[in-house]
């Protein structure tokens, strides 16, 4: 299984943590598409704590963290 952790507005309608079968998702992009997250809403993508790109491969046991752009002021 792949653990996907969502943050801030990405949790809306999806939850905080989503578990997905590794064999169905060859890369982070396929997970982002499955969760119906527009790519422009992905500001930071971490795989096992390391900054990665959506085309990076994922495997069983990976922890994916997806953060949206954050504004403030």
Locations of the language-model features?
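Ubiquitin-like/PB1-type beta-grasp interaction modules and other compact soluble beta-rich domains
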Residues: 1-72
């Amino acid at each position: 299984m792949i653990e996907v952790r969502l943050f801030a507005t990405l949790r809306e309608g999806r939850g905080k943590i989503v578990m997905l079968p590794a064999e169905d998702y060859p890369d982070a992009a396929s997970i982002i598409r499955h969760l119906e997250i527009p790519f422009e809403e992905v500001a930071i993508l971490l795989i096992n704590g390391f900054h990665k790109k959506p085309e990076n491969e994922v495997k069983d046991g990976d922890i994916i963290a997806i953060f949206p752009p954050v504004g403030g002021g």
